[in-house]
């Protein structure tokens, strides 16, 4: 009998064990972050279960309401938002919540407050629920100096001030990708155990990739640098092979593929939407944080994405993120345009 093999299967690094290990490296830690993360993990498990049962439980379809973005809300959108608001509030470790689904920030009542602000998109890509495409939850976490007097200014910070970010993808498996500021790790939900197990330790994005990811349906409205970059991807003049286009209307799915395989994800501004469509706080910042922690880059067309200082909780920004060298290429095109302007 292969006892060594059995031992390998039983020595599982769960996400809770991983975070506790990280906590032990910081003597000043009191366990607040671990408790907060456990509530986020619980929310992800609940939403994963709801997504898997959506068709049977009649959660597919519209809820008959629109969110602050003017988008029709799916039933799962509404449910997912309620799940995360309740999970984060009951943790006793948050003071402000910003959700894609809510017009205003949620200020936690004083008796339940903690030192963290959480920004999140409870169900990114929900447009694809009905057809079974991978969708996900995106989140970012800030820490405040004084939670008793916390204001909106404590949330409107540059992304570089985040203490953690991640996403949970609900697809063929349920995968949670997390960074606490010291690299990126991926955990997969084992349904038989009900635990997220470390399956992708220390994720590093390749320096250059063979894939680009963009909605080419908007090409006629793109600016010069984006148009030139995509042309270069399809028709390289340096003798290299063309890049392959891979795109689906789910940021989590696109970014997850880019993170693992390399390449670049582009959501530029255009003539119709000069500021792009992705929200800074709970889409651009968390994904940019993860990309940088994995060795990649994130750029807005003007500056490093994580240096942006938002002025509104639902502010939008263009973003180009992915492999370091691929993002360098599009940065060079924007720099060249600046020189000729």
From Swiss-Prot:
The keyword Metal-binding applies. It comes from the Eukaryota. It is found in: Cytoplasm. Mg(2+) 1 binds at residues 71, 100. Its cofactor is Mg(2+). GO terms for cellular component: cytosol. It is an enzyme of class 3 (hydrolase). Binds 3 Mg(2+) ions per subunit. It catalyses: beta-D-fructose 1,6-bisphosphate + H2O = beta-D-fructose 6-phosphate + phosphate. GO terms for molecular function: fructose 1,6-bisphosphate 1-phosphatase activity; metal ion binding. Substrate binds at residues 124-127, 215, 247, 267, 277. GO terms for biological process: fructose 1,6-bisphosphate metabolic process; fructose 6-phosphate metabolic process; fructose metabolic process; gluconeogenesis; sucrose biosynthetic process. It holds the Pfam family FBPase_C. Mg(2+) 3 binds at residues 121, 124, 283. Its EC number is 3.1.3.11. Keywords: Carbohydrate metabolism, Cytoplasm, Hydrolase, Magnesium, Metal-binding. Belongs to the FBPase class 1 family. In plants there are two FBPase isozymes: one in the cytosol and the other in the chloroplast. This is Fructose-1,6-bisphosphatase, cytosolic. The lineage of its organism: Eukaryota, Viridiplantae, Streptophyta, Embryophyta, Tracheophyta.
């Amino acid at each position: 009998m292969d006892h060594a093999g059995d031992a390998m299967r039983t020595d599982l690094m769960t996400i809770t064990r991983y975070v506790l290990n990280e906590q032990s490296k910081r003597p000043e830690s009191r366990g607040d972050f671990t408790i907060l993360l456990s509530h986020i993990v619980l929310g992800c498990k609940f939403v994963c279960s709801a997504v898997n049962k959506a068709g049977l439980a009649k959660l597919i379809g519209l809820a008959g309401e629109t969110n602050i973005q003017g988008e029709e809300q799916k039933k799962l959108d509404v449910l997912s938002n309620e799940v995360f608001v309740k999970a984060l509030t009951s943790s006793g470790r948050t003071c402000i919540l910003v959700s894609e689904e809510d017009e205003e920030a949620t200020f936690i009542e004083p008796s339940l407050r903690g030192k963290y602000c959480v920004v999140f998109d409870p169900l990114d890509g929900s447009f694809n629920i009905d057809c079974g495409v991978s969708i996900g939850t995106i989140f970012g976490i800030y820490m405040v100096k004084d939670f008793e007097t916390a204001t909106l200014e404590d949330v409107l910070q540059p992304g570089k001030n985040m203490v953690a970010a991640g996403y949970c993808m609900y697809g063929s498996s349920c995968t949670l990708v997390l960074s606490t500021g010291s690299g990126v790790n991926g955990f997969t939900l084992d349904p038989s155990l009900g635990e997220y197990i470390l399956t992708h330790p220390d994720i590093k994005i390749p320096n250059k990739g063979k894939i680009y990811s963009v909605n080419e349906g908007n090409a006629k409205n793109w600016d010069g640098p984006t148009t030139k970059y995509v042309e270069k991807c399809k028709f390289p003049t340096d003798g290299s092979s063309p890049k392959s286009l891979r795109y689906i209307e789910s940021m989590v799915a696109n970014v997850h593929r880019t993170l693992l395989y390399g390449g670049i994800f582009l959501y530029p501004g255009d003539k119709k939407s000069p500021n792009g469509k992705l929200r800074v706080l709970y889409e651009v910042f968390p994904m940019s944080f993860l990309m940088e922690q994995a060795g990649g880059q994130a750029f807005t067309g003007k500056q490093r994405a994580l240096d942006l200082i938002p002025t509104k909780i639902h502010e939008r920004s263009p973003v180009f993120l992915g492999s370091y060298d691929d993002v360098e290429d599009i940065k060079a095109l924007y720099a060249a345009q600046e020189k000729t302007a």
